[in-house]
């Protein structure tokens, strides 16, 4: 594979990252060699490229070299197929056909998913060669739930790879039985009812796929429900719904058929001609536009959640106005908003909040951009004012009566490329105006009009929203101004009249209300647009006025001015998930992966468990090797079985307590007690799965006391230490208590794989100012940031600096948490490993320059990164490449960071759950270098130019496809394999501060104490927004959230189980004794009346205060009747006369 093309400066940056990693690896390996951990070496393999990630993820030695060889001469999709030739040739040591097929399919899927997600390891359960009814063989691939993370394209191509390899092995095609075909149809529809897939093919399309697909797409059971028809089929192993199978057929082959067809054509594969029929018949009807242009789409309004407001209905007047551009913190599914908009909307849209949008995608992340327009509001005084700064928003917030326009939404060209959405007319703006002849920003309205005489369009600041008005409204306003208005010293006075006020608000003309008059201080363009002279007389143009399609064309004709639409295209939006910046915690939070069973109670307290165990009776150990007098301080728990290779001691610890040697896991058969050898999965004698677990009798009191001594703590001063109830990994390996004590001391928590993580919402950033990230210029210069984006020396905190792709800005809260993690790691090295401290940090700024590991949920590859700053926002800012390397965009996705040394020292595969999906969200490999060719392709569409040419804006007016206009735009894909792929990026819009705006969303504000408060606040905001229909919103909330919840809980109440809160045993019915049969504790209901009735009162409140349909009102009444019939009506207290005195 060709070497990465970089500038010398960027190569030096990469070398610095690798040097820091090498130093950390050396120290971590030295520490791990002491044998304290499950393995005496760092368990996170390092990979510098895609091929290396694939090999590290799957463990097939030699496959990386082959992938590099193939990718040098063909596309990745072709390489994913051709790698099958190497497996068929047994180049990597496979011996059976099943191994060849299994490894080839997993490798191709890893290649297609950038070697990042867990789908290749977890999404394929197994492959099998089975027999058709005619005696021939066919290939069956068993897909599991985690196949979802691969995406539809990789899912579909994995089937194509299976077909390619089975041909090489002379295995025939799958020949389905009729009842199997119908089973697929019914099962996929049932799975869609459970999980709501992205795309559901028609029944006949499913039949077409199954009849013609040469591979049997099978699957493991993933859901709780069983299929109702076509059960107990001979060649289908389960009656339970198989989610993985449904995903591959529907969202894979059904949705991605065109992409499969392209690859079939490239590889000249026969037997897939039926795809043409599938493609011609499965175009989703909802995707087809009725006519050129864009039309209102309310898909984003479905599934409304109570308390999360709607800000703009689809293409509604007063909604978000589309502005074309990319700010330095937008792109990759993130959109910019003026900070004033964020505050005026009651702080619901905090920085990092997700917003569901009408177009061009489904959702976006919210970030501030001060270069775009804010909201236009009516104040309680009657004044109409546009608010463009956060200071003004704070000043006028309490005076706002009505929000007439919620401002602009900045969307980049790349978003239209990524979503394959037609371009659409943007709001007229200064950067467009300048390219159409505007010489400079006008000082005032008179100068703006003088520019028009020179051939320019009217400047956007003086272009009103003419196209929002009808012809009749403009005629009415013109008559009123001509008849009753007066122009004095350049200021227009119009007598108060609600009808006049309404039209002025439609036009969004700023004005005040003074002494009975509407006062317009910038009246010239308004007067001309109304066809009036400077004496407010009707101009001659009125006499020859033709009919018009909209108010803008009428105003242009009356005024003679060149004007464009200030409204542009409105975009609907509602609040999605709130932002997040919080430590990752297990439920309940724990400090150490040490099992204590039920001894620690609900809190899993190890120190309490040690005290409780000291008073346990001998009965707890009856039948064990413990004799009378030995009971004190002991617990019996399930742990891994390990043996010291030197002295033979059997223990549960990773290090032998007798001789200090690292111990080995012991696997044995649970049935015949036969010992297994390393690498064996099943018993060589009886075939049962080998296990590495046993009932261990642990002297918890002694272990706890020894751990306290080892870390220099006393029982009286040590913090509460929390462990786990049990271990769920195959080896059931135990963490040393010392690690837990040090974590508890520093108030940090462990995740299931031994690491300490901090979760944040993802946001993109390509440039930053030192002043906004809380780091001094001197500190930044010390880590390599010596120049600003223009090449000048970095000397001032206000200069703009281009962010390196593997540098990140974490939240301030995260920085403070990582300081504690660093203190823990230093103490761990000193007190457990007997080595020198590594971090020596006291403040968050001390972390600048230190390396971290980024990891996204559902993936298995960490990304090496470096902390260079902090943001006040509850989010993490990083380069688009960094997010794409984790297969994430920034539409509300979140992931985590962990200090590099913590991950290297504490992560172990031995801690991971042995169940399906156990290796997801675990750093099975670490990517050291980001290559734009090897990250998620969405980032290739990020545009990086300082301004869009005029051709792009004119293309927007005619709804051109973005690919037709791409030749005029500089975006990442054009820079790949040049030094410009890493540096020299630019942006069209700037922002003062990437954290400016609300930091915490109102949705999570404790002032809103419950759902009722949240709904009232949501509807109160909706009442003040012109772009929202409050009655419709109330109905949507009831029908999509409140009613389904109440009805579902009412049904669950009658079917509920009962549970012992002490030992967690569940019962279908309460035992006759009323107590738990296992531990004697109380048995309690899991569903209560409050769960059922919690939304009833707020639903009745909404029905009373808003206009709902008869259907919804009746649903509320019927639900109340059902609740009353279940629980009985509340008793009404009879009052007498004395109660009123």
Curated annotation (Swiss-Prot):
Membrane-spanning intervals of the chain: none
InterPro entries, A to Z: PolC_DP2, PolC_DP2_cat_dom, PolC_DP2_central_dom, PolC_DP2_N
Enzyme Commission number(s) of this protein: 2.7.7.7, 3.1.11.1
Alphabetic keyword roster: DNA replication, DNA-binding, DNA-directed DNA polymerase, Exonuclease, Hydrolase, Multifunctional enzyme, Nuclease, Nucleotidyltransferase, Transferase
Keyword Ribosomal protein listed: no
MF term (GO), any: DNA-directed DNA polymerase activity
GO biological process, one term: DNA-templated DNA replication
Coiled coil residues, start to end: none
Region (Disordered): 567-587
Catalytic activity as recorded in UniProt: DNA(n) + a 2'-deoxyribonucleoside 5'-triphosphate = DNA(n+1) + diphosphate; Exonucleolytic cleavage in the 3'- to 5'-direction to yield nucleoside 5'-phosphates
Chain's role: Possesses two activities: a DNA synthesis (polymerase) and an exonucleolytic activity that degrades single-stranded DNA in the 3'- to 5'-direction. Has a template-primer preference which is characteristic of a replicative DNA polymerase.
Subunit structure: Heterodimer of a large subunit and a small subunit.
Family: Belongs to the archaeal DNA polymerase II family.
Protein name as catalogued: DNA polymerase II large subunit
């Amino acid at each position: 594979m060709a070497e990465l093309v970089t500038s010398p400066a960027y190569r030096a940056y990469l070398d610095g990252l690798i040097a820091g990693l090498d130093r950390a690896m050396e120290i971590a390996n030295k520490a791990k060699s002491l044998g304290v951990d499950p393995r005496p070496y760092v368990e996170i393999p390092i990979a510098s490229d895609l091929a290396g990630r694939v090999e590290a993820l799957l463990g097939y030695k030699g496959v990386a070299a082959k992938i590099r060889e193939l990718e040098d001469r063909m596309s990745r999709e072709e390489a994913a197929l051709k790698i099958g030739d190497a497996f068929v040739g047994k180049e990597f040591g496979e011996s059976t056909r099943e191994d060849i097929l299994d490894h080839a399919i997993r490798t191709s899927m890893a290649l297609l998913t950038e070697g990042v997600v867990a789908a290749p390891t977890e999404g394929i359960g197994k492959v099998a060669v089975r027999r058709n009814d005619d005696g021939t063989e066919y290939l069956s691939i068993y897909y599991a739930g985690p196949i979802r993370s691969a995406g539809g394209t990789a899912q579909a191509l994995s089937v194509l790879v299976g077909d390619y390899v089975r041909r090489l092995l002379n295995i025939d095609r799958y020949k389905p039985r009729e009842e199997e075909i119908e089973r697929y149809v019914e099962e996929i529809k049932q799975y869609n009812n459970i999980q709501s897939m992205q795309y559901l093919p028609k029944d006949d399309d499913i039949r077409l796929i199954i009849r013609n697909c040469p591979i049997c797409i099978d699957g493991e059971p993933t859901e709780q429900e069983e299929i109702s028809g076509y059960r107990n089929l001979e060649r289908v192993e389960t009656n339970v719904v198989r989610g993985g199978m449904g995903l591959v057929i529907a969202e894979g082959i059904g949705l991605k058929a065109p992409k499969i067809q392209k690859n079939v054509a490239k590889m000249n594969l026969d037997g897939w001609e039926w795809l043409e029929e599938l493609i011609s018949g499965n175009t989703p009807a909802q995707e087809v536009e009725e006519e050129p242009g864009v039309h209102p789409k309310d898909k984003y309004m479905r599934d409304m959640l109570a308390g999360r407001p709607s800000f703009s209905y689809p293409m509604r007047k007063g909604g978000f106005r589309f502005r074309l551009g990319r700010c330095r913190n937008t792109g990759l599914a993130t959109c910019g908003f003026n900070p004033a908009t964020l505050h005026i909307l009651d702080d619901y849209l905090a920085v990092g909040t997700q917003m569901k949008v009408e177009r061009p995608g489904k959702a976006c992340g919210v970030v501030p951009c001060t270069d775009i327009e804010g909201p236009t509001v009516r104040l309680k005084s009657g004044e109409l004012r546009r608010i463009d700064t956060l200071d003004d928003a704070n000043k006028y917030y309490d005076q706002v009566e009505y929000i007439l326009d919620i401002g602009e939404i900045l969307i980049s060209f790349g978003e239209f490329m990524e979503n394959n959405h037609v371009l659409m007319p943007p709001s007229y703006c200064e950067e467009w105006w300048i390219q159409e002849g505007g010489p400079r920003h006008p000082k005032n309205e008179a100068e703006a009009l003088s520019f028009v005489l020179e051939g320019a369009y009217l400047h956007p600041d003086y272009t009103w929203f003419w196209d929002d008005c009808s012809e009749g409204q403009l005629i009415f306003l013109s008559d009123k101004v001509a008849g009753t208005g007066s122009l004095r010293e350049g200021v227009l006075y119009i007598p108060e009249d609600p009808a006049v006020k309404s039209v002025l608000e439609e036009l969004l003309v700023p004005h005040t209300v003074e002494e009975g008059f509407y006062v317009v201080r910038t009246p010239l363009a308004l007067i001309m647009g109304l066809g009036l002279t400077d004496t407010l007389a009707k101009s001659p143009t009125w006499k020859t006025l033709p009919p018009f399609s909209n108010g803008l064309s009428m105003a242009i004709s009356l005024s003679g001015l060149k004007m464009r639409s200030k409204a542009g295209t409105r975009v609907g939006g509602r609040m999605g998930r709130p932002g997040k910046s919080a430590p990752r915690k297990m439920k309940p939070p724990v400090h150490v992966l040490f099992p204590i069973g039920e001894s620690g109670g609900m809190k899993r307290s190890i120190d309490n468990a040690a005290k409780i165990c000291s008073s346990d009776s001998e009965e707890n150990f009856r039948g064990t090797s413990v004799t009378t007098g030995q009971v004190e301080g002991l617990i019996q728990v399930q742990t891994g079985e390990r043996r010291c290779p030197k002295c033979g001691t059997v223990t549960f610890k990773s290090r032998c307590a007798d001789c200090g040697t690292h111990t080995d896991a012991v696997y044995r058969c649970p049935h015949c007690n036969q010992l297994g050898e390393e690498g064996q999965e099943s018993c060589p004698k009886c075939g049962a799965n080998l296990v590495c677990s046993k009932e261990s009798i642990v002297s918890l009191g002694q272990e706890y006391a020894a751990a306290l001594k080892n870390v220099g703590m006393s029982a009286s001063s040590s913090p509460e230490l929390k462990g786990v109830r049990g271990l769920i990994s195959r080896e059931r390996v135990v963490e040393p208590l010392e690690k837990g004590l040090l974590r508890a001391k520093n108030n940090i928590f462990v995740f299931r794989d031994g690491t300490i993580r901090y979760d944040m919402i993802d946001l993109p950033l390509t440039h930053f100012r030192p002043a906004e990230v809380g780091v001094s210029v001197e500190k930044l210069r010390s880590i390599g940031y010596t120049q600003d984006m223009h090449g000048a020396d970095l000397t001032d905190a206000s200069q703009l600096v281009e962010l390196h792709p593997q540098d990140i800005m974490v939240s301030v809260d995260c920085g403070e948490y990582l300081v504690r993690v660093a203190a823990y790691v230093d103490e761990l090295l000193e007190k457990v490993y007997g080595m020198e401290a590594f971090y020596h940090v006291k403040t968050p700024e001390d972390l600048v320059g230190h390396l971290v590991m980024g990891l996204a949920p559902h993936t298995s590859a960490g990304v090496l990164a470096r902390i260079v700053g902090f943001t006040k926002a509850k989010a993490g800012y990083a380069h688009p490449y960094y997010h794409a390397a984790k297969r994430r965009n920034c539409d509300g996705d979140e992931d985590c960071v962990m200090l590099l040394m913590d991950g290297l020292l504490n992560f172990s595969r031995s801690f991971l759950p042995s169940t399906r999906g156990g290796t997801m969200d675990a750093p099975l490999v670490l990517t050291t270098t980001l290559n734009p060719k090897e990250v998620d392709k969405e980032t290739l569409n990020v545009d990086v130019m300082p301004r869009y040419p005029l051709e792009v804006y004119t293309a927007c007016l005619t709804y051109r496809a973005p690919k037709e206009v791409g030749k005029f735009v500089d975006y990442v894909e054009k820079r790949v394999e040049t030094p410009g792929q890493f540096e020299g990026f630019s942006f069209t819009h700037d922002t003062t501060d990437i954290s400016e705006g609300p930091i915490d969303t109102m949705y999570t504000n404790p002032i809103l104490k419950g759902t009722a408060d949240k709904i009232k606040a949501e509807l109160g905001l909706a009442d003040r927004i012109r772009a929202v229909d409050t009655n419709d919103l109330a109905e949507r909330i009831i029908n999509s959230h409140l009613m389904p919840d109440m009805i579902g809980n009412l049904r669950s109440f009658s079917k509920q189980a009962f549970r012992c809160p002490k030992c967690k045993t569940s019962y279908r019915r309460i035992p006759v004794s009323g107590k738990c049969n296992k531990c004697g504790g109380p048995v309690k209901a899991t569903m209560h009346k409050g769960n059922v009735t919690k939304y009833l009162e707020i639903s009745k409140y909404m029905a009373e205060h808003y206009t709902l349909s008869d259907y919804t009102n009746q649903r509320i009444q019927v639900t109340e009747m059902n609740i009353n019939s279940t629980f009985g009506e509340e008793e009404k207290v009879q009052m007498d006369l004395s109660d009123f005195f």
